[in-house]
Curated annotation (Swiss-Prot):
It comes from Ictalurid herpesvirus 1 (strain Auburn) (IcHV-1). This is Uncharacterized protein ORF32.
């Protein structure tokens, strides 16, 4: 596994879409690459296909205002991108409540799973984001 940071070629290829975590009342800004509208199985390809594909999604819950009584959290979504044998993680530090989509799962199932780890009455000083890059 190797680390990397996001660059202009990646950030310029994404567009923002809104989403809500079901049952939590928490609004999530979402970043979706246009090709992520394909199914995850299509994006990930076959096991013999070694081209870079979407292989996971990181969710970062971020503190908007400082709180000296709690650990700091950076506003940094994590993106898992690469081949099945060579995973690249972008901005993996300070990731909280992380989950990874598996082949055959869809975004709705992922959000339902993630919502169980989000408070039902979210702290207004927190925001959350999901980054999807393919």
């Amino acid at each position: 596994m190797r680390g990397a940071t996001t660059d202009d070629s990646i950030t310029s290829s994404v567009r923002a879409l809104p989403a809500v975590v079901p049952g939590s009342g928490l609004f999530l800004p979402m970043v979706l690459h246009v090709s992520s509208l394909l199914s995850l199985d299509q994006l990930m390809g076959s096991k013999s296909d070694d081209r870079p594909r979407l292989i996971g999604i990181g969710v970062s819950v971020t503190r908007v205002t400082p709180d000296p009584t709690r650990p700091a959290m950076a506003h940094t979504p994590s993106v898992f991108l690469g081949t099945r044998s060579d995973l690249i993680m972008f901005s993996p530090h300070n990731l909280k409540n992380s989950s990874v989509l598996q082949p055959g799962n869809d975004l709705s199932s992922f959000l339902l799973s993630f919502s169980s780890s989000v408070p039902r009455n979210p702290d207004p000083n927190f925001s959350a984001s999901i980054a999807i890059v393919s």
